[in-house]
C-alpha cells in the first residue's frame, strides 16, 4: 500500500511518462504528479481537447500531442481514456510499448486481457480503478499487476498515489 504523501515523491523520475487522456481523472493524475515534483519535461500528454491549464504546461516543457512515433524510450504509459474509445486508442499505443514499459490503465470496464490483446506486445500491465475522490487527491485506488516486476509495480504505485492511497 502506498499513501499519497512523501513516499510517492516523483522528483527523481527521469524517464518518459505518456498520459493518454487528460480529462477529469487523467488531469487529476497529471496535477498530482506535478505537485509531487515530476518535471513536465518528462511528460507527454495525448489529449485531443486539452484544458487550458494543460496547454499552459507546454511552456514548461510538457510535450502536448506529439507524434507518438517521436516518443522513444517510454518508461510508462497511463491510459485514462473513456472505455468507448479504447478499441481505437489502445492498439495505437503499441508503438510506444517495449518489454520494459509499464502500462497503467484506469479505464472503467476494460480488463487486463483486453489490454494485453489490444497492445499485442509484451509489457508490464497494471489495471487500476481509482474512486471518485481521487479527482481531488483523496481517493483510494486498487491496482492489479500482470507481468510486472516489483520495480514496475512500485513505479505504478508511485504514479497512482498522486491521487490518494493505493492498494
What residues fall within each predicted segment?
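NAD(P)+-binding Rossmann beta1-loop-alpha1 motif at the extreme N-terminus of oxidoreductases
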Residues: 2-68, 138, 165
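Rossmann-like NAD(P)(H) cofactor-binding subdomain of soluble oxidoreductases
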Residues: 29, 55, 60, 64, ...
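Short, conserved glycine- and acidic-residue-centered signature motifs
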Residues: 18, 108, 149
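Short, glycine/serine-rich, charged loops/turns that create anion-binding
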Residues: 24, 50, 110-111, 132, ...
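Internal alpha-helical scaffold of NAD(P)-dependent oxidoreductase catalytic cores
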Residues: 114-124, 140-167
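Structured catalytic cores of enzymes that bind and process phosphorylated ligands/cofactors
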Residues: 22, 92-93, 151
Amino acid at each position: 500500500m502506498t499513501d499519497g504523501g512523501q513516499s510517492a515523491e516523483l522528483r527523481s523520475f527521469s524517464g518518459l511518462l505518456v498520459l493518454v487522456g487528460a480529462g477529469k481523472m487523467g488531469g487529476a493524475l497529471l496535477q498530482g504528479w506535478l505537485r509531487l515534483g515530476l518535471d513536465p519535461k518528462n511528460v507527454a500528454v495525448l489529449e485531443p481537447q486539452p484544458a487550458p491549464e494543460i496547454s499552459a504546461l507546454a511552456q514548461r516543457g510538457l510535450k502536448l500531442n506529439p507524434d507518438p512515433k517521436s516518443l522513444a524510450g517510454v518508461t510508462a504509459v497511463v491510459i485514462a481514456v473513456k472505455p468507448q474509445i479504447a478499441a481505437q486508442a489502445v492498439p495505437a499505443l503499441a508503438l510506444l510499448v517495449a518489454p520494459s514499459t509499464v502500462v497503467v490503465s484506469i479505464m472503467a470496464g476494460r480488463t487486463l486481457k483486453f489490454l494485453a490483446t489490444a497492445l499485442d506486445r509484451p509489457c508490464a500491465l497494471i489495471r487500476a480503478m481509482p474512486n471518485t475522490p481521487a479527482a481531488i487527491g483523496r481517493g483510494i485506488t486498487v491496482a492489479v499487476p500482470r507481468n510486472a516486476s516489483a520495480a514496475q509495480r512500485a513505479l505504478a504505485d508511485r504514479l497512482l498515489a498522486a491521487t490518494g492511497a493505493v492498494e
